[in-house]
């Protein structure tokens, strides 16, 4: 007894097309979501790298803080080895003399480096001079360290283990003309970065020596 082959009915075709469309939509949505997740993950990884790089550079600066005052660009006075402003609107907020400036190519320049930190337009920026005693015409090498920053606060621990909001402390500010006073270093530096996405990040750097 023979049987006849029959084709799909219109209803069956519509159901099959609907199922195929649904599977395509689900597959596309999954791929699209995976791509979004991948982009978000990369963004988070880039942000983490930015934060870690910022912290590492600040650590290298403060750990290698040297007691080396510099001449003022104008006049005969000197600036302290470390000058930290208590006014958060003052620029630069911190400037310091540091050692350990690597010179792999053997360029004729000092092994010490004068570094300054600026906070402008929600960005923490690091600048350094190529000479230790800059003049007005001296230029700096600039690098944005961290973006999306709401505020930056520095504190400095003195030998009595008391935190100061400026450096040199107000107790020695009247003796700023003495070169020995300008060499005074804290035993530790605390930085607080209030960021838009990670909240407050606090690090304490112990000053060597």
State where each predicted segment sits.
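N-terminal single-pass transmembrane signal-anchor helix
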Residues: 1-31
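Periplasmic/lumenal scaffold domains of single-pass inner-membrane subunits
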Residues: 124-127, 132, 142-144, 150, ...
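Extracytoplasmic beta-strand-rich oligomerization domains located immediately C-terminal to a leader/signal peptide
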Residues: 27-135
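A short, polar/proline- and glycine-enriched secondary-structure boundary/capping micro-motif
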Residues: 106, 134-143, 165
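Short linear sequence signals and composition-biased patches located at protein termini or domain-edge surfaces
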Residues: 151-209
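Short, mixed charged/polar active-site loops
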Residues: 112-114, 140-142, 199-202
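Structured surface patches comprising rigid loops and adjacent beta-strands/short helices at the edges
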Residues: 68-71, 144-156
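A generic structural micro-feature
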Residues: 88, 107-111, 141-146, 181-185
């Amino acid at each position: 007894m023979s049987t006849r082959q029959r084709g799909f009915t219109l209803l069956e075709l519509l159901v099959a097309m609907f199922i195929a469309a649904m599977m395509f939509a689900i597959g596309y949505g999954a791929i699209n979501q995976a791509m979004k997740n991948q982009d978000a993950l990369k963004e988070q990884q880039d942000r983490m790298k930015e934060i870690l790089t910022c912290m590492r550079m600040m650590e290298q600066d403060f750990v290698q803080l040297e007691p080396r005052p510099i001449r003022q660009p104008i006049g005969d006075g000197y600036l302290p080895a470390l000058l930290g402003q208590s006014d958060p609107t003052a620029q630069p907020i911190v400037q310091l003399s540091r050692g350990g400036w690597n010179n792999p190519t053997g360029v004729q320049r000092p092994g010490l480096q004068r570094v300054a930190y600026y906070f402008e337009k929600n960005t923490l920026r690091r600048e350094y001079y190529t000479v230790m005693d800059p003049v007005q015409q001296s230029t700096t090498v600039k690098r944005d360290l961290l973006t999306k920053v709401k505020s930056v606060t520095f504190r400095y621990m003195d030998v009595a283990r008391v935190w100061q909001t400026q450096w040199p402390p107000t107790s020695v500010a009247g003796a700023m003309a003495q070169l020995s006073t300008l060499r005074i270093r804290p035993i530790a530096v605390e930085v607080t970065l209030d960021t838009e996405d990670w909240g407050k990040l606090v690090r304490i750097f112990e000053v060597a020596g």
